[in-house]
Amino acid sequence: IIKSYSQAEFFTKLPEIEEEIKVVTYVAAEGDISTDLLSPGNQAHSRSDRELHGKCMISEDAQLEIRKLQKENPDKRVMIVSEKGTMGVGSSRMSGVNNVALWTGIQASPYVPFVNIAPIVAGTNGISPIFLTTVGVTGGIGVDLKNWTKKLDSNGDPIINNDDNPILEQRYSVDTGTILTINTKKQKLYDETGDKELVDMSSSFSPQKLEFMKAGGSYAIVFGKKLQSFACKALNIE
């Protein structure tokens, strides 16, 4: 075991991440989604109980709809979407990511109940940076959809409505139930068929983020390297 850790086999022996991930969308809200929607502050007392705290994510109706999407699309992952907004504003809130993973992620271990990893979240305006860091802790994927853009006039300036807000044009739909394809090799988001490119995702798949996804989260990398250093020291390997 020590020799294996000294050779970093805790990481090198892991399978590569899937080249193609099919997702089905669930629009949790229109506009920015606060982490308080995912893990309400008034339910903080239950955060140590993953199963119990998971029941407060968004709403009971939302949870039923997510389960329905999973039942109808057993070969696809549910992607939580902030339509016309940014996902995860407010705080990093690990419990919020844990809740999203609990409902839509992958089971971390068959021996540890209610601990899931690798959720997929998305926002028209991307993911809040501090929340995106927490998504990386679980080996998840954050998608900057860019599915709405500002409508421009002939001079290239945004067209403003009567409320002094820019008029938006939809580039493609992510309405609840929409099936999309994430290609991790090409680092792009495609339509259901995988033929039509919708948006570039290279920022979601930096070398470091790919490591986190392969390992099942950043903690696996951090503590794996600590164990590797210990193993090398024990075996007098530099």
Residue ranges and their predicted role:
Residues 1-238:
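Fe-S-dependent hydro-lyases/dehydratases of central metabolism
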